[in-house]
Swiss-Prot record:
Species of provenance: Dictyostelium discoideum (Social amoeba)
Region (Disordered): 1-71
Protein name: Uncharacterized protein DDB_G0289969
Start-end of Polar residues biased regions: 7-33
Taxonomic lineage: Eukaryota, Amoebozoa, Evosea, Eumycetozoa, Dictyostelia
Bias-annotated ranges (Low complexity): 35-65
Amino acid sequence: MLFETLKSLSQQNGGQFSDEQSFESPISSSFNGHSMPFGSPSSTMSSSYKGNTNSSTKSSSAFFSRPFYSE
């Protein structure tokens, strides 16, 4: 489910998230203004991106329910 969301966001954002490295960078800068109660944005997103099913996946998936990148 989360992976499908990421692929969808990748298409909307012009393929910016084509691989993990280009995925982490915009996430980190986009999340600067948000309060992050768990870990750093890149590490949390990275582990969710790899499909880990742990508590951080549930927390971070809330961020995927609304746009987090700025146009």
